[in-house]
Amino acid sequence: RRSSDLPVEGENEEGLTDRSLLDMKSIWNFINTVDVVDIKEVIGRQIEYNTAIADEGLRGDYGANIGSVLLSAYGDDVRTRAKARAAAGSDARMNGCELPVIINAGSGNQGMTCSLPVLEYAKELNVTEEKKYRALALSNLTAIHQKTGIGRLSAYCGAVSAGAAAGAGIAYLCGGGYEEVIHTVVNALAIVSGMVCDGAKASCAAKIAASVDAGILGYNMYLNGQQFYAGD
């Protein structure tokens, strides 16, 4: 009997968190109305831990040093820093650094990807602490929401969905409303959604940089009156 003829059982999600209740409108309403005190502990821990490993990734010699390469090759504007810090966190995590990371959807790389670029833009724009926490809630929930359709274990590169989520958080920080946020996500996914996961390793950092770049480009596309449609 050929292996291709063997029956394949579907994902068993019994007892796991039900994410099907999430949609972008509900996420948007939540992040704009939640008392920041209620999310400050968990988001604050993400800020502390993920910032620390990004700093270490830029200080040390890890993997291909994608974060450092980005800053050296392209300068230190906010867009480059946003990509570099997310990549640097992955440089460290994928190459032996034992510092803890606050995950998203079960993944450290995705946790760093949907938080560190948003933090860099929050610093650049000098937004209030409240706005920063709301932006991070948006990016984290947007990343989780996308995984509802992707699944918990998939050949789809999770950096892609997390990069799009970072774009959503950045759009919010820059003053974008609901339409800007959702079109940012759609545009970002149209750019890099063909990327597959080929394992957790050093090259994840470069995939993260590309995905964050797509998130930022997706937002700038919509600002300039451009967007991808079905089939594009």
What are these regions (language model features)?
Residues 2-3:
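Short, small-residue-biased leader/transition segments that mark boundaries at the very start
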Residues 10, 18-75, 81, 175-232:
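Functionally critical mobile loop/hinge segments
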Residues 63, 72-75, 89, 93-102, ...:
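Soluble metallo-hydrolase cores and metallopeptidase-like ectodomains found primarily
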Residues 77-96, 128-146, 186-194:
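Acidic-glycine-rich active-site phosphate/pyrophosphate-binding loop
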Residues 93-103, 143-153, 196-201:
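Glycine/charged-rich beta-loop-alpha catalytic/anionic-binding loops adjacent to active sites
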Residues 97-116, 157-162:
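Conserved phosphate/anionic-ligand binding catalytic regions in large, soluble enzymes, centered on
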Residues 111-127, 168-175:
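Alpha-helical support elements that line or immediately flank enzyme active sites
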Residues 152-153, 157, 161-182:
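C-terminal structural cap/anchor segments
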